[in-house]
Amino acid sequence: MEVVVARQPKAKKQINLFYCSECEELALKVAASSDTIHLQSINWRSFDDGFPNLFINNAHDIRGQHVAFLASFSSPSVIFEQISVIFALPKLFIASFTLVLPFFPTGSFERVEEEGDVATAFTLARILSMIPKSRGGPTSVVIYDIHALQERFYFGDDVLPCFETGIPLLLQRLRQLPDADNITIAFPDDGAWKRFHKLLLNFPMVVCAKVREGDKRIVRIKEGNPEGRHVVIVDDLVQSGGTLRECQKVLAAHGAAKVSAYVTHAVFPKQSYERFTHTNSAGSADKFAYFWITDSCPQTVKAINQQPPFEVLSLAGSIADALQI
C-alpha cells in the first residue's frame, strides 16, 4: 500500500519592517496587506549642527528575526541618514535583512559618454553593495523598474539585487476599464519597448521615436497604428514629462480615441506634474484620460493628491510579496 504524504505549505516569514519618515504611508499599506508584516520604528532626529541623531527602537527584540527597511532616496540630503540605519540593522543579530528601495534614483545616470562623466548609478550601487551581512547572509535589495537592467551588474557579490516591476499593477487596472478590449500600448522610444514589450504581448503596440528635423528633435510614430484606440504610453519614469506630452500630441494627431500614460516612478522635479493636471491642460486634445503612477516616490504622490488625470497604483501588495522571497 502506497502512502502519500501531503506536502505542508511553506510557512511565511514574519517580517519586522522599519521605514524612513516619508515612506510611512506606504509602510502602513504594506503592513495592512499582509499579517506577516510588523511595523517597527526609528527615531529620526538631528543634532544642532544638522547631522543625524538616530535611534532604532526595539533593537533587542528583533534579534533572531527577519528585518526589512523601506527606503526613499528622494534627495542626496536624506541618503546619509538612511544609509546609516541600513548599515546598522544587519549588525543587530537579525536572521536576515532586506532593503526595499522602490525607486533607484540615479538609475538614469549609468553611462559615460565622454571622459569626465561620472556614472552615479554605479556609485550608489557600490555603496549599497557594502551593506554588512546579517546572520542569514547577504542583504536582499528589492528595486522596482530600475532604469537599465544592466545595472544589476553594478552591484557587488555581497548583496542580492532583486528586480521587480509595477507592470502587473497596470495590467490589473487596464482590465477594469470599460474599453479594456480597445487598448493599445505605446512606447516613447526603443528603450522602453525593449524593456517592457515582453510583459505586454497581449496588446497591439505603437513605438515612437525622436528624430532630428533641422535643429529640433521631434517625436514620430515609428511603427503601429493608434487610430480609434485608447493608447496607453508606458515608461519606467517621468521627469519633466516633455517626451510624454509630445507622444500624446502625435498619437492624437494620428487618430487615437484617447491617450493615457503609465510610469512606475513619478519623479516630477519642480512640480512639473502640474503640466498634466486637467485644470492646466490647454484643451481636451491635450489631456491625458488617465495618468497612472505608483507610490515609489512618496513626496510626489503627496503633492499630486489624486488630481485628475492621476491615479496611484500602490506597490504595497507587491512589496509584501517580495519580502517573502
From Swiss-Prot:
InterPro entries: Pribosyltran_N, PRibTrfase_dom, PRTase-like, Rib-P_diPkinase. It is an enzyme of class 2 (transferase). Residues 228-243 are annotated as: Binding of phosphoribosylpyrophosphate. Its cofactor is Mg(2+). The keyword Kinase applies. GO terms for cellular component: cytoplasm; ribose phosphate diphosphokinase complex. Mg(2+) binds at D145, H147. GO terms for biological process: 5-phosphoribose 1-diphosphate biosynthetic process; purine nucleotide biosynthetic process. Binds 1 Mg(2+) ion per subunit. NCBIfam families: ribP_PPkin. This is Ribose-phosphate pyrophosphokinase 4. The lineage of its organism: Eukaryota, Viridiplantae, Streptophyta, Embryophyta, Tracheophyta.
